[in-house]
C-alpha cells in the first residue's frame, strides 16, 4: 500500500470513530429537544402574574388558570386543546397548532433513527436535518404568534389595563416561554450538525468509490490486453499498403 493510501485509510478510520461519537451526541440532544418540545406544549407557564397584577394566574398555549382577585389564591383553570372554543385567543390557537406541529416533526425525526439500520447514513441524516429545521421554524412561528393574543380580555383582567398585543402589562414571561426559545436554538444547531454529518458521509462514500473504480478499471484493462500487446477477442487486421508499380 502506498504511503498516501495508508494515510488516507488512517484518516478515514479516525474520522469514522469521531463521526460515530458526534452522531450519538446528536441523537441524545435530539431526544432532549423532543422532551423540551413536549414540555412547552403541555405546560401552562408561558406567562404569569407578578406582585402588582390585579389577579393571580398563569397562561399557556391552550390551558390557563386565573384567580378571583380576592385574598385567596384559589385558581380556576380552563382550556383544552381538544376544545378550541375554550382557548381565549385565536393567536393562542395558532401558536398551539404550530408548536404541536413542531412536536410531531421532532418525534417523527426520532422515529427515523431506525432507518440507520436499513438506509444510507447520509440520506437519513439529511432527512432528519430537514425535519429538525422545519420543527425549529414551527416553534419560531409559535413563539412569535403567541404574544399577539395578549390583548385577550381574560389576560387583560389578570395583567391589567396596560396589557396589549406584544405587551404584557404587569405580568411577566414564565419559564416555559424561555424554554421554547432555547429549544429553537437547540433545533437549529442540531439541524446544522445533521447537514454537516450527512454531507461528510456522502464525501466519504465518494472517496471510497474512487479507488474501487480505479482497481476495477485496472483489472479490466489488464485482463483484456494480451502479453503481446494484442487486444483479446480482436484480430489484428493487416493494414493495406499501396504498392507503387514501375512504369
Curated annotation (Swiss-Prot):
InterPro entries: LHFPL. One of its GO terms (cellular component) is postsynaptic membrane. Pfam families: L_HMGIC_fpl. The chain crosses the membrane at residues 22-42, 97-117, 127-147, 178-198. It is found in: Cell projection, Dendrite; Postsynaptic cell membrane. One of its GO terms (biological process) is sensory perception of sound. This is LHFPL tetraspan subfamily member 4 protein. PANTHER family: LHFPL TETRASPAN SUBFAMILY MEMBER 4 PROTEIN (PTHR12489:SF14), LIPOMA HMGIC FUSION PARTNER-LIKE PROTEIN (PTHR12489). It is a multi-pass membrane protein. Interacts with GABA(A) receptor subunits. Identified in a complex of 720 kDa composed of LHFPL4, NLGN2, GABRA1, GABRB2, GABRG2 and GABRB3. Interacts with GABRB3. Interacts with GABRA2. Interacts with GABRG2. Interacts with GABRA1. Interacts with NLGN2; leading to mutual regulation of protein level and synaptic clustering. Keywords: Cell membrane, Cell projection, Membrane, Postsynaptic cell membrane, Synapse, Transmembrane, Transmembrane helix. Belongs to the LHFP family. Plays a role in the regulation of inhibitory synapse formation and function by being involved in maintening gamma-aminobutyric acid receptors (GABAARs) clustering and their associated scaffold proteins at inhibitory synaptic sites. Acts in concert with NLGN2 to recruit or stabilize GABAARs. It comes from the Eukaryota. GO terms for molecular function: GABA receptor binding. Its main location: other.
Amino acid at each position: 500500500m502506498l504511503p498516501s493510501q495508508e494515510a488516507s485509510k488512517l484518516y478515514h478510520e479516525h474520522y469514522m470513530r469521531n463521526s460515530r461519537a458526534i452522531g450519538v451526541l446528536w441523537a441524545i440532544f435530539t431526544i432532549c429537544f423532543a422532551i423540551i418540545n413536549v414540555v412547552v406544549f403541555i405546560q401552562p407557564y408561558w406567562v404569569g402574574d407578578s406582585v402588582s397584577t390585579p389577579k393571580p394566574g398563569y397562561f399557556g398555549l391552550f390551558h390557563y388558570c386565573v384567580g378571583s382577585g380576592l385574598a385567596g389564591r384559589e385558581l380556576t383553570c380552563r382550556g383544552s386543546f381538544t376544545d378550541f372554543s375554550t382557548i381565549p385567543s385565536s393567536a393562542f390557537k395558532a401558536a398551539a397548532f404550530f408548536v404541536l406541529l413542531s412536536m410531531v416533526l421532532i418525534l417523527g425525526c426520532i422515529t427515523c433513527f431506525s432507518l440507520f439500520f436499513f438506509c444510507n447514513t447520509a440520506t437519513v441524516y439529511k432527512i432528519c436535518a430537514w425535519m429538525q429545521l422545519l420543527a425549529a421554524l414551527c416553534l419560531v412561528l409559535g413563539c412569535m404568534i403567541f404574544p399577539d393574543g395578549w390583548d385577550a380580555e381574560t389576560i387583560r383582567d389578570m395583567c391589567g389595563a396596560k396589557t396589549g398585543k406584544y405587551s404584557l402589562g404587569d405580568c411577566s414571561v414564565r419559564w416555559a416561554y424561555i424554554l421554547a426559545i432555547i429549544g429553537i436554538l437547540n433545533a437549529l444547531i442540531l439541524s446544522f450538525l445533521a447537514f454537516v454529518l450527512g454531507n461528510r458521509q456522502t464525501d466519504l462514500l465518494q472517496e471510497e468509490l474512487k479507488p474501487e473504480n480505479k482497481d476495477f478499471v485496472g483489472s479490466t484493462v489488464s485482463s483484456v490486453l494480451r502479453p503481446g500487446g494484442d487486444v483479446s477477442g480482436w484480430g489484428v487486421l493487416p493494414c493495406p499498403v499501396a504498392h507503387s508499380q514501375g512504369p
